[in-house]
Amino acid sequence: SKGLVGSEMCIRDSTAIHNPTEGVTYQLGNLTTINSKYKIMTVCDFRTQDIAMGGQGAPLVPVGDSILFSKFTACLNLGGFANISRKKNKKVIAYDICSVNIVLNYLSMKKRIKYDKNGLIASSGKIITSLLNELNSLEFYKLNHPKSLGVEWVSDVIFPILENFLIKYPLESVMHTYVIHIVNVISLSLSPSDKILVTGGGAHNKYLIKKLKLKTEARIILPSNEIINFKEAIIFALLGLLKVLNINNCF
C-alpha cells in the first residue's frame, strides 16, 4: 500500500506457459527489471527453479501450509485450479486435482458475467449424465501424484468437451454438471477423518461448497475472508522470507 516500505519483496509470478512433463514453464515478471526499479532484494520465479530440480512447479504452497496451518490435516485451494497439500507418512504431498474457476469463469463470461456469484447459475441447471461421465473419465485423474495442471490442458481438453455439449444443452446445465464434476474429483482426495481448510475464490461459491459438504464426510472449514482471499499471498511472502534466510522453501 502507499507509504509502505519493506526490505525484501517476493513476487508471486503469473504463469504464462506450464508443461512440467516437458520441463517447461514460463512466468511473467523479470527479476532484474523489478529489482532495478524498486532497489530492494527481490525473490521470484519459484516455478522455474522447482521444475529445474525435477518438481512439477505447482502447487508451491505446501511448505507454507505445513508451517502456518499445521492444525489442519489438509489444505484445499479452490482457485483457477483445485490443489491440495497434506501430510502423509511424515512427508508433505501436494498436487493439482482439477480445474475450477478457470472453467466456471469461462462459462460465466458467455453470459457476460465475470463469475458465477454464489453459484447461482450452476444451481439453476440440471445434471447431464453423459457429460459428467466423460469428464470423470479423463486420463489426468488416473495419474499418480505428484501432478500439476496448466491452462494448456484446460484449453486442449476441457473447453472442447464443454463446447460440444453447449451445442445441445443449456449453459446452466453444463455449468451445473461441471460443479458436480469438481466435487466428485475433489472428494476422491479426501477422507472422512480429514479436517480441511478451504481457501481461494471458489470458497466463496456457496453452491460449490454446499455440494462438497454433501459429497464428503470430511470436515470442511472456511476461515475468515482475509485468509480465503490472501492465504496464497501470505505463503508466497513466507517462501520469499525463507529464501532470504537461506532456509529450504520447497519440499
Question: Where are the model-predicted features located?
Answer:
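Single conserved hydrophobic/aromatic residue that forms the stacking wall/gate
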Residues: 1-11
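Phosphate-binding/catalytic loop of phosphoryl-transfer enzymes
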Residues: 20-27, 35-36, 40-115
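Glycine-rich phosphate-binding loops at beta-strand->alpha-helix junctions
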Residues: 24, 195-212
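Hydrophobic alpha-helical hairpins/lids featuring a short glycine-rich hinge
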Residues: 12-21
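A short, acidic, amphipathic alpha-helical segment used as a generic capping/interface helix at domain edges
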Residues: 183-190
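Glycine-rich phosphate-binding/hydrolytic loop that grips phosphoryl groups
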Residues: 223-251
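Active-site metal-binding loops of divalent metal-dependent hydrolases
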Residues: 15, 80, 201-204
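Conserved ATP-utilizing enzyme core subdomain
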Residues: 93-183, 245-249
